Amino acid sequence: MTKTFEDIANLVRSLVTPLVDNPDEVSIASDEMEDGSLLIEIRVHEEDAGKVIGRQGRVIKAIRTLCRAAGSRNGQHVEVELID
């Protein structure tokens, strides 16, 4: 995994951890796909999922937008998924 991918995963962790009531249960997994894109999977305590999603999905959309912007600076595609 490249430094950029690690930086984006750390960005996700720094954005998600302050949002939740159970920060010890935040898990960020990143995997480089065959096409070179990055898949980031966010796992949180089930009670915290709503906080990460936000009203009408605004929070998770904002996280996805930031990650895509960070990846596009280096010509890389980034997908962010919240796993329940």
Task: Give the location of each predicted region.
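Glycine-centered tight-turn and secondary-structure capping sites
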Residues: 53-57
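RNA-contacting regions in translation and RNA-metabolism proteins
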Residues: 1-49, 62-84
